[in-house]
Amino acid sequence: MQYPEPIAKLIDSYTKLPGIGPKTATRLAFYTLGMNEEDVQDFSKALISAKTDLTFCSICGNITATDTDPCVICRDQSRDQSTVFVVENSRDVMAMENTRDYHGLYHVLNGVISPSAGTGPEDINLPSLIRRLSEHEEIKEVIVGTNANAEGEATAMYLARLLKPAGIAVTRLAHGLAVGSDIDYADELTLIKAVQGRTKL
């Protein structure tokens, strides 16, 4: 059976989300149709707001409200200014913040080096990290928190080679994070132990 065009478009929109196949997209579309109009309006406004009222912090690359740049973490002078935790995305920042154990700064790459995907160092938020480190001599350590997969390891090793001549300590998250695992899926205790047991690259 062919669905009316508005439903077909809605289903197609849902299938563009990660992990959503045609069956789940169809269920979501019909669930949306069953919502009252006010909830649908709120939902659509939230989607639009997420795209128009958010930006990336001009210092660290973390996601922030357009009227809060630099982000609240970069503005917080009580944080340890000597340590920068490099992560792949903003979800990783939230995962670390939820541990309440790390009190330094962050730098969000918004990607990883992936030759197979044609993504090089210049395609992610690496140039701004190098510039940031050169402008702030108080930064003494970079903790590399990229995920424990091939792309994450490649990015970590690239960073280590790049920063070693500058005399900045480059460390990597330690035990507890399984190979292939993502930081934002790890529990808080595992993340705390991984940071505490970090090793030099």
Curated annotation (Swiss-Prot):
Segments forming a coiled coil: none
Location of the Toprim domain: 82-178
Zinc finger C4-type: from-to: 57-74
PROSITE patterns: RECR, TOPRIM
Gene3D superfamilies: 3.30.60.80, 3.40.1360.10, 6.10.250.240, RecR Domain 1
A Pfam cross-reference name: Toprim_4
Keywords assigned: DNA damage, DNA recombination, DNA repair, Metal-binding, Zinc, Zinc-finger
A GO BP annotation: DNA recombination
Family affiliation: Belongs to the RecR family.
NCBIfam families: recR
Record's protein name: Recombination protein RecR
Gene that specifies this protein: recR
